[in-house]
Structures are given as structure tokens and as C-alpha cells.
Amino acid sequence: MTRSRRTEQTADTRQALISAARRRFAEQGFAATGTEEIVADAQVTRGALYHHFRDKAELFRTVMEQVATEVAEQLVAGELARDAELPSDAWTQLRQGFQSLLDISTADSDFQRIVLIDGPAVLGNQAWDALVERHGYRLLSEWLERAMAEERIDPLPVGPLTRLVAALLSEASIYTAGAADPDTARIEIGIVLDRLLRGLGRGGDLAEQPPVSVDSGSGRTP
């Protein structure tokens, strides 16, 4: 077997494990998923699993990174496809993007279970915070700086502001994913989140910060 073919097979085995684990983690959760189920679904040996991943937790972290990256790319793609007639200022766009993330938190079962529900419990607070930082802090801070430059929000230290806004969004997403009635929770938390964010408006003038839609289907706004 050539080196290139061996490398290709190794990559295929790793991807088979990730795909099988993702299905199981999304359907059953981390705690209820056994490694024997994963290797059976992937049609590989247990030795292959431990060749690529130290343990089930490391495999879970890899799956979670994959799901989080896909959601981030989905949000960026949604912004690129945004209706040109909608408000173009950074602050309104950012707040609408937050509502889009809440929609994903409600509709995407992989994101719900793997990232929002099991993620904090399996990784712990420090690793969870690191994930949020990798997948959102830089972009969020850039948008907040744009909103300040456009004088849409009050000038504030961008570092702590980014962390606080990210924490609000993270908790709102977790609340929605874990609710008994996710659809109702998504509407309610969307209203509360946007009302809090509107308070950051220039001079605290809510009249200058009209609410964004929290449900594109029903058109409900606060």
C-alpha cells in the first residue's frame, strides 16, 4: 500500500468515527453513548478509535467543534444573503444575527444536544469558554467596534463588552435548547435579549433602537 493511500484510509477512518459519534451524540447524548456503539456504526475496531482519539471525551470535543464551526458558517452565509433593503447598520445586523442563532438553537438538533446541552457539562466551564471565544469573540468584537464607529451604541471598552454580550447570547441559546417548549422559549428569550441589547443604544435612547423581529414566521416583536 502506498503512503498516500494509507494516509487516505487513515483520514477516512477518522471521519467515519466522527460521523458515527455525531449521530449517536445527537440522538442519545454523551452519557448514554458507548464507544462500542460508535465503533460498530463506523465499522472500525476499538483500536482504531483509540488510535485517533484519547478517549470518548476527546472525540466529543472534535464533534462539537465541527458542529459549532458549521453553525458559525451558517450565520455568516445568512448575513451574506441578507435582503439589501433591510437596515445595513452593524448594530441592527448584529442583533438580527443573534435572533438567527436562537432560531438555530431551536431547530438544529445536533447544535442543541451536542453544543448547548452536553457541551458545557462534558467540557467544563474553562473549555466551554474557550470554544465560545474561538467561534465568536473576534467576529463579535469587530461588529461591536463597527457599531460604535457608526455611533449606534455608546463607546465602551470592547473587550469586556464582547464577553458580556457573548455570555448573554450563550445563556439565551442554552435556555432555548433546554426548554420544555422550545418554540415559546425562543420567542420569549428573543424579546428579552433584544430589549437588553437595545439598552446599549447611543445615549440609552430606546426610541432610536427599534426592536428587531424575534420570529420571522409570525412577525411578533415586543
Feature names for model-found ranges:
Residues 1-12, 82-83, 204-222:
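N-terminal intrinsically disordered/low-complexity leader segments
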Residues 1-28, 32-44, 57-61, 84:
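Basic, helix-initiating cap at the start of DNA-binding domains
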Residues 50-53, 57:
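A short His-aromatic
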Residues 61-67:
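Alpha-helical DNA-contacting segments of helix-turn-helix folds
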Residues 62, 76-110, 161-165, 220:
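Hydrophobic alpha-helical connector segments
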Residues 69-72, 124-150, 159-163, 187, ...:
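Amphipathic alpha-helical packing segments from all-alpha helical-bundle domains
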Residues 93, 100-102, 141, 155-175, ...:
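Hydrophobic alpha-helical segments that form the core
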Residues 102-141, 174, 178, 182-183:
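Short secondary-structure transition hinges
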